[in-house]
Amino acid sequence: MPKMKTVRGAAKRFKVGKNKIKRGSAFRSHILTKKPSKRMRDLRGPQYVDSTNVPAVRKMLGV
């Protein structure tokens, strides 16, 4: 049986750590001038994949 291929789009979007899968943050790419500083601060921290989506992301990454 051949090896499972990694979904390349998923490989570019997710980073796997010891027990969590890190993802990029939405609402931080453009049109930032009209967004309040408080909202930008709240969006600043690390973002992780929700536990309901972890199995699907792991399958895409071949982990």
Swiss-Prot record:
Biological process according to GO: translation
Keyword match Ribonucleoprotein: yes
Keywords (A to Z) from UniProt: Ribonucleoprotein, Ribosomal protein
Tagged with keyword Coiled coil: no
Record-level GO cellular component terms: cytosolic large ribosomal subunit
Highest taxon of source: Bacteria
Protein name per UniProt: Large ribosomal subunit protein bL35
GO molecular function, one term: structural constituent of ribosome
InterPro entries (UniProt xref): Ribosomal_bL35 (IPR001706), Ribosomal_bL35-like (IPR021137), Ribosomal_bL35_CS (IPR018265), Ribosomal_bL35_sf (IPR037229)
Family (UniProt): Belongs to the bacterial ribosomal protein bL35 family.
